[in-house]
Amino acid sequence: MNSAFASNDLSILMLSSAGQLDRRPDSRDGGISTNMSKRKSFDVEGLGHANPIPAVSRIGNIVATGGVSGTDTSTGKIPDDVAAQCARMFANLRTILGAAGATPEDVIRVTVWIARPEIRAEVNKEWVVMFPDPHSRPARHTMFYDHFAGSMVVQCEAWAVIDIAAGHV
């Protein structure tokens, strides 16, 4: 058995952005690594949650949003119009990603929840506006959800990986 992977060894082998293995102490042994990233949470004015949940969190170059709705940030209200909700949702996603230093080009996965099947067509219209290159779109999964609050009919969340090597911080 390779001693680097012995069961009593409480280290984690991490793959660095340069593709190198980096040995870091496991938190179970109380070890602290100055190289290990810490989570940062970001709130975005007009897009807060009623619960103590940030709009977006980031560890190193990984970004994850909370739920992103089609709230109109100037009024704080959800538009009644489905097309307007979808357009605002993607605009809000761009704003939320930006708070953590990410852009739509960094997005690797989006999950969308819709109240009714016909909403998918409106999501698709805004999807191709935000991600116009058919050869460089993030993965997406769309699911039906029937417990939205008020007039909300669409919501999404996204994961992004920031290209630190390209100078994005």
Pin down the residues of each PLM region.
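N-terminal presequence-like segments and the immediate start of the first folded domain
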Residues: 10-13, 26-91, 95-108, 114-169
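Low-acidity, Ser/Thr- and Arg-rich intrinsically disordered low-complexity segments
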Residues: 1-7, 11, 16-17, 24
